[in-house]
């Protein structure tokens, strides 16, 4: 069975929804024809010349880091990145990026990192707020007209909750108003305070149907100026967001946990470094694949003993250590995100099976490639 690039993109967009990407990010298809047949997929953190060399003809290169992001106004073949784009296109190869959408997806980059170091994830470190895609309507209507108004908003699309329709809640109360000159009150008269037995009717409706529900409510409501409220509902987080929090099988000293990280992650020139009491017992850990010092304040307030991330800068780390007992473990950026490659590969394998060969490129693309102390070359 042949697999089109568009089919692969559909699966990747389901696993790593583009809506989760940061506003500044660039994710999705970089080059390639969605209608073309894809013979294989290679997964890597970065698109470098050495990585591109490993992508077979008519293959897709799925990467985490965007090749084209900031300030790109040319892909000329005599530029470092442009030459890669030309090489890919000339041989029928495609390039696709899942970056901050993969960071926040569930499972995503930090889930893969947590799993690699032996954590059982039980929370999101910095959850993504749910999209406000539902409204709650509160409508105040004379009791004798409440059924008509309720029926009208139901017809306009309100009142659906899961597998149920015509859902509403109401309570009796008393409405009060004073009509002034120019008004045409349906009940009472100008200049007289009126008190009316009313129902407070509550329903939910899709935010996209707001105009239709409003028009239906106004048409069915007897009042010239109906009283109503619209509340945009934000659903609770559903597991997406930056970073994860998880537990070790049993507590262990920080020095042992650091050794665990060193063994679990692929070797890099910069290795693993930590800040904290070596004898601190660690059982609950926060992780964030990629640069994570923006979450230090969140980590300090979390119920964790250690934080694993990358690219920790001197001053933010110093300020954290002065104010918090949470140990810091800084690993190479590439190493913290490499476990995601296996996760992404498994997403595709589980969907396409033998019809689409998928492999993980193990080339270390961390820019730091020489360990001065040992002379070990990671290139």
UniProtKB/Swiss-Prot annotation:
Keywords: Metal-binding
InterPro entries to which the protein is assigned, alphabetical: DUF34/NIF3, DUF34/NIF3_bac, DUF34/NIF3_sf, N-reg_PII/ATP_PRibTrfase_C
Superkingdom as given in the UniProt entry: Bacteria
Residues that bind a divalent metal cation 2: 65, 333, 337
Listed GO MF terms: metal ion binding
Coiled coil residues, start to end: none
Binding residues for a divalent metal cation 1: 64, 103, 337
GO cellular component: cytoplasm
UniProt cross-references to Pfam families, sorted A to Z: DUF34_NIF3 (PF01784)
UniProt family annotation: Belongs to the GTP cyclohydrolase I type 2/NIF3 family.
Subunit structure: Homohexamer.
UniProt protein name: GTP cyclohydrolase 1 type 2 homolog
């Amino acid at each position: 069975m042949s697999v089109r690039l568009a089919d692969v993109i559909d699966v990747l967009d389901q696993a790593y929804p583009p809506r989760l990407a940061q506003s500044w990010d660039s994710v999705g298809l970089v080059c390639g024809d969605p209608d073309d047949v894809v013979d294989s997929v290679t997964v890597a953190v970065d698109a470098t010349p050495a990585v591109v060399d490993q992508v077979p003809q008519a293959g897709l290169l799925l990467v985490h880091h965007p090749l084209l992001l900031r300030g790109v106004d040319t892909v000329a073949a005599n530029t470092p990145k442009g030459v890669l784009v030309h090489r890919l296109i000339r041989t029928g190869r495609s390039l696709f990026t899942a970056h901050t959408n993969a960071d926040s997806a569930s499972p995503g980059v930090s889930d893969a990192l947590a799993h690699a170091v032996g954590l059982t994830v039980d929370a999101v470190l910095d959850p993504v707020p749910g999209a406000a895609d539902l409204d709650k309507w509160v409508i105040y209507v004379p009791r004798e007209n409440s059924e008509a108004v309720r029926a009208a908003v139901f017809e306009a699309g309100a009142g659906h909750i899961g597998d149920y329709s015509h859902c509403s809640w109401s309570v009796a109360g008393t409405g009060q108003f004073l009509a002034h000159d120019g008004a045409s009150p349906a009940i009472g008269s100008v200049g007289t305070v009126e008190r009316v037995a009313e129902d407070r009717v509550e329903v939910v409706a899709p935010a996209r149907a707001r105009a239709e529900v409003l028009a239906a409510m106004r048409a069915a409501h007897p009042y010239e100026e109906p009283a109503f409220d619209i509340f945009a509902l934000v659903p609770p987080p559903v597991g997406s967001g930056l970073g994860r929090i998880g537990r070790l099988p049993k507590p262990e000293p920080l020095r042992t946990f650091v050794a665990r990280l060193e063994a679990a992650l692929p070797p890099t020139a910069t290795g693993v470094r930590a800040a904290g009491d070596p004898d601190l017992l660690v059982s609950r850990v926060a992780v964030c694949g990629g640069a994570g010092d923006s979450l230090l304040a969140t980590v300090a307030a979390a119920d964790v003993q250690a934080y694993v991330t990358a690219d920790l800068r001197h001053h933010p780390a110093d300020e954290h250590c002065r104010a918090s007992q949470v140990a810091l473990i800084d690993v190479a950026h590439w190493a913290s995100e490499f476990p995601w490659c296996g996760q992404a590969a498994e997403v595709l394998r589980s969907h396409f099976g033998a019809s689409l060969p998928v492999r993980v490129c193990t080339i270390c693309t961390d820019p730091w490639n020489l360990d001065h102390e040992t002379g070990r070359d990671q290139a």
